[in-house]
């Protein structure tokens, strides 16, 4: 593992790092203002994590890129992603909320079967969700409802009820991301125009004959976006997938000849 990255395998280990009680071995809702003050560090989690930050906390390092992490930002991470801030020796008090849950929690549930539909877990931090005040209140309400269930003694209903409430939170995130795609239409149109120019350049030579259609991953990389965010944005803006637009692009010169 790369030097300077701290791997946190499970929910108990994360709770221990923050100095909070573990109410359930597979899931935790944390009021970060009540966590221990801590130094900046880069992490890899062995579980899903959703962070709502309520203070501006400077440059956040995701992978090898720096992003300005603003107040009221929601970031969703899948297991295995690298995130954090490089240690500069400072100690800070985090503020906001965190929901962390292990894949084992949702295995065999509706959420476990549909978790791949929540493609924002693979978005990059610069593609994070920026919440309105009303949206923030709804997200915090979901956190509190999950925590309320965690404070109940674990019984045969616990897993299903917790998973249902997490699924509701993720469905709200889907709705809010769709709103964000709409309200950022000017930015999205610019990305779409850049994508069209990228296709023009790709098909202008013989690269398509040598390599076939450009992959979504390649196109996203050229546009400095994650594949999932790029694919979702193109679908929302055009009603078609990036691959479908590539196929249409192939036929256009033919129609013009």
What do these predicted regions represent?
Residues 1-68:
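Generic protein-terminus/edge-of-domain signal
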Residues 59-61, 83-90:
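Short beta-strand His + acidic residue motifs that chelate non-heme Fe in jelly-roll/DSBH
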Residues 69-83, 100:
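Conserved metal-binding segment of the jelly-roll/cupin
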Residues 88-152:
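A hydrophobic/aromatic-rich effector-binding and dimerization subdomain
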Residues 137-200:
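An amphipathic alpha-helical interaction segment
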Residues 195, 199-203, 234, 238, ...:
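Short hydrophobic clusters on alpha-helical segments that form packing/core surfaces
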Residues 213-250:
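Basic/polar phosphate-binding segments, predominantly the helix-turn-helix DNA-binding elements
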Residues 249-257:
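Single conserved hydrophobic/aromatic residue that forms the stacking wall/gate
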């Amino acid at each position: 593992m790369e030097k300077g990255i701290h791997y946190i395998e499970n929910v108990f280990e994360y709770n221990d790092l923050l100095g909070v009680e573990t109410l359930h071995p597979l899931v935790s809702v944390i009021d970060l203002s009540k966590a221990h003050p801590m130094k900046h560090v880069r992490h890899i989690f062995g579980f899903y994590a959703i962070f709502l930050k309520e203070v501006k906390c400077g440059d956040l390092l995701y992978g090898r890129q720096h992003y300005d992490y603003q107040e009221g930002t929601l970031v969703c991470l899948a297991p295995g992603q690298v995130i954090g801030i490089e240690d500069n020796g400072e100690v800070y008090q985090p503020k906001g909320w965190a929901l962390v849950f292990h894949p084992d929690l949702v295995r065999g549930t509706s959420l476990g079967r549909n978790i791949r539909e929540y493609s924002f877990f693979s978005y990059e931090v610069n593609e994070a969700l920026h919440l309105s005040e009303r949206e923030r209140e709804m997200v915090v309400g979901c956190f509190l409802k999950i925590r309320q269930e965690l404070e109940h003694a674990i019984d045969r209903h616990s897993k299903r009820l917790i998973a249902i409430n997490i699924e509701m939170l993720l469905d709200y995130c889907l709705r809010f991301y769709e709103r964000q795609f709409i309200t950022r239409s000017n930015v999205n149109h610019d990305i779409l125009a850049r994508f069209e120019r990228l296709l023009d350049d790709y098909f202008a030579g013989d690269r398509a004959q040598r390599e076939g259609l450009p992959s979504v991953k390649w196109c996203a990389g050229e546009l400095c976006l994650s594949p999932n965010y790029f694919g979702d944005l193109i679908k929302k803006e055009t009603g078609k997938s990036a691959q479908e637009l590539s196929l249409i692009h192939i036929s256009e010169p033919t129609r013009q000849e």
